[in-house]
Amino acid sequence: MEDITMKAALVYTSTTPELIELVEKEVTKNIGTDAEIISLQDPSILAEVREAGYVTKTAAAARLIGMYMEAVAQGADAILNICSSVGEVADSVQTAAAYIGVPIVRIDEEMCREAARLGKRVGVLATLATTLEPTKNTISRVAR
């Protein structure tokens, strides 16, 4: 009998060691220590998004989609998009992800669902201004 191990791809737009360590620890805790972590990182994506003020219609969006496809090519069973500033790119490829059979999950999705469930008015605090609009859009979407 073949040993089946979960492969989770973590897609980062930052190479902050503390963030990577924290996320990998939490993912391992939630999916098991025998899971394989695929870590894909491109800090130029977030740098470009910060400079432009948004992710849509940028080369950064194309590179991020390329990272999702690289995760699929490496055999990922699921992809976790770590950056809220680019979460709408993950949203935009959900139909393709369904066809491929590899879900792309936003790190902030459940937080937004819970905020929408619990409150009539939701405040958003962020470390980057580029996170505000995508997060507000996600809260509005999941509240419907």
PLM region descriptions:
Residues 1-144:
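Non-catalytic structural scaffold of enzyme domains
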